[in-house]
Amino acid sequence: MRNLQWFPGHMTKAMRMMEENAALTKDAFADRLAKTLEKRSQLLKIMSMNHYDMESSSRPERLTEFKVAYGESLRAMMRCLEQYFPEMPTAEKQNFIYAFFPFMFGIYPYTVVNEKQREAMEKAGVNYVFMTIYELTCKCARHLLGS
């Protein structure tokens, strides 16, 4: 759990960075959000591991510490959505958050594919579209925002 401590801090910094802009379009917001994760492959790799087991085996005080910080990052995202998209209904903002945050747990395995996986997909006839962390994240955020 110790390695995950910097996840909420990163999100808080990312939200703070976005808060420096008085206004952003949906596309610009998606772009900024994607850029905050683009260089965080290690974070995304940790998140894609068996998170449930990691939390289950963590000491209660560490897990609580993480959950407090995680809650702060959810609230930071809500503040950004409220600032940039005041016309968006609260339910839609919540839908964005509760779709985007779980989505982050799957970014790494969809964007970092080793040669063995690539070869297996090719042999299996899987028409897989390879995307970067930025591309996948930006597409998801744009879709969730209706952009």
What residue ranges belong to the model's regions?
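C-terminal peripheral helix-coil segments that are non-catalytic and often amphipathic
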Residues: R75-R79, Q83, E87, F103-S147
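Non-membrane alpha-helical structural segments and their capping/turn regions in soluble enzymes
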Residues: Q5, D27, T64-R75, Q94, ...
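Secondary-structure edge/capping motif, primarily at the C-terminal ends of alpha-helices
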Residues: A14-A22, H51-E55, L81, E115
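Short secondary-structure transition hinges
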Residues: A34, E38-R75, Y128
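Hydrophobic alpha-helical connector segments
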Residues: R2, W6-K45, T90, F96-F100
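Short, charged/polar micro-motifs that form catalytic or ligand-binding hotspots
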Residues: A23, T64-K67, P86, T90
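A short small-residue
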Residues: D53-S58, E92, A120-A124
